[in-house]
Amino acid sequence: MKKTNKPKKQGKSGKPKKNKSLAKRNKHELIKAIFSVLQEHPEEGFNYKQIAAKLHITDAPRRDMLVKQLVQLKEKKRIVEIDRGKYQAIPMQHYYVGTLDVSSRGNGYVIVDGLDNDIFVAQNFLNKALHGDLVEVYVFPRFRNRNKMEGEISKVLERNKVRFVGTVQMHKNFAFVVPTDARMYTDFFVLKDKLNGAQDGDRVIVRIEDWKDKSDSPMGVVEQILGKPGEQTTEMHSILAEYGLPYTYPEEVEAFAKKLDLSITDEEIARRRDMRETLTFTIDPRDAKDFDDALSFKVLENGNYEIGVHIADVSHYVKEGTILDEEAYNRATSVYLVDRVVPMLPEILCNFACSLRPDEDKYTFSAVFEMNKKAEVVDIWIGRTVTHSSFRFAYEEAQSVIEQAKVGEGYTIPAETSITDKERAVPAEVVEAILTLNTLAEKLRGKRMRLGAITFDKVEVKFDLDENGNPTGVYFKESKEANKLIEEFMLLANRKVAEYVAKMKKTFVYCVHDEPDADKLQQFNTVINRFGYSLDLKNRQTTTDSINNLLEEVKGKKEQNLVDTLAIRSMAKATYTTKNIGHYGLAFDYYTHFTSPIRRYPDVMVHRLLQLYLDNAPSQPEAEYETKCKHSSQMESLAASAERDSIKYMQVKYMEAHKNQQFAGVISGVTEWGIYVEITVNKCEGLVRARDIKDDYYTFDEQQYALVGQATGKMYQLGDEVMIRVKNTDLMKKQLDFELVD
């Protein structure tokens, strides 16, 4: 066929249509050229004619483009006009790159690695940057040599996310989606044909499509309808979607999991250590379904104990390269909201095939210890096993055994404690196992504390829920001996597995916890001084000892939750990495996560690496595993945020029935816009706005971390006891508003 020259596309004016990508490329080339001229002679100023001459620009269209770019670069604070029409490049040291943290009031703070203080950015200088974005910020000259820097966002380098949760507000031919996140300072403009079936009032997921320079709001498209606000499922799905977390399982992954061979075969048993005859049991929360771990116990002829820590062998079923593994990696963790669990694995695996349910043979990965009566590890064996759990205990049941039973005798768990709501008989050999393990756990814990471990027994807020998932009461979960028994043996297994691989000097996944920042510890010390406490910060040992003494001393006191929270905030965050630095909080030189592969992907990686190295495989690619570690750390952080939001939501919902009621509370936070108060009896936290404190005009004193009345000098500080009235509850924002009561 003969080729013909196609006519060029014509615009409405009849002129050839511009090649947008070419124009964009030409623009970027011109900007680079402008900077090359200005940076070559940084002390001089150049007007557009001089720059044009240096760049050999002679035609009028390109000169016009040059003038336009100079004006835009000046507006973006990339160059400065030192004299009329004369420009200089702004030195790059006046720019910083960091992560934008937007407050609920709409202002932002850019967090820059290496800077002691964040850079404040007023809302009108955010320039379309959103919470969590990686940004470039220009610092205003008058603030450069001060502790408090202020600036303007000059460039969004990377969006944190493009999908947001909000509520549809319909207009005639368009709609706005109002975000649920108070840190989002703009609505989304959505054309009618981009609503995809969403109606007025629907809660939806909206994706940013475009945000034009002169538009106040970004253009969006509705991707998913979550439901009607106020419905429990809608609200929980909204929380998950806000953090980019899934709430359903892809059908193709579920189908893949259902086709797996889940049987226990003789061939596979032959490849494993068979421990089905050894006494084995699980201790878990009352409502648990995913039993990751079990303990086995046997008295040896030499008087020592054989103690097995047996972990669900998830990697036997979840193979690398499958869609099942890909989905598990993407999720990286199970998410535990107040009223539901969003599992990392399909239900057929997490609650059935992998779960170490009683009276079923299971494939496990085990660390088996020989331990003497001093809780010293004499010998260790690590490898794949097959086990059989004979008993399943709730923590309350095991605690009942610890408190009431005697060695050498059987024990009956009372009906009111039993998970069956009936009396349960516990054989004498199981009683002996639990009591002996508890004694050994206490010794293990004592050793850790002497080495400088820190014990955080922060109070966990739990809710009584009715059949519709609505909160009817609040209670606090305590960590007792049964919890600590399991904790100590899981810590032991995690530590010993990490030490075992570390000796090989091969790539591995570690859970590390850096030393706390000295300034944060000093700030924490300053706050607790107001309660009459103090820390000895001379060295690591005195620091950890005094923190432990403090945490023990505040137990049961009104300030306990505040002190516990501030202590945790003063610490670094634990993360996953291939580069081991030890675990400060646990006082371990080596530590990993081996014990929860049903709900944590790093544990799956640990199992795989461990088996490879047991089979004498070479070290695996470090860069690949470091990337997976970072992803896992990020996903666990997002999951923790979602879990906190679900608690806040339930607290607000619970307090709806208590509007206008008065409660005693403790000031848990102080800001320039008000004080946060935590109600003592239920740990619900709300805001008393500074403008609502009518007896004076209050301003924030940063040095004393207090709101101070300008006329009276009256102060509101962290830890002060106050009486409040519940003024308002906002379920959408998950916020409580309080007012002070005289």
Kindly give the residue locations of the regions a language model identified.
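Charge-lined substrate channels and their catalytic hotspots, especially those that engage the 3′ end
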Residues: 2-308, 315-364, 392, 400, ...
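Electropositive polyanion-binding surfaces
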Residues: 53, 205, 211-212, 238, ...
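A short macromolecule-binding patch
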Residues: 117-122, 184-190, 683-700
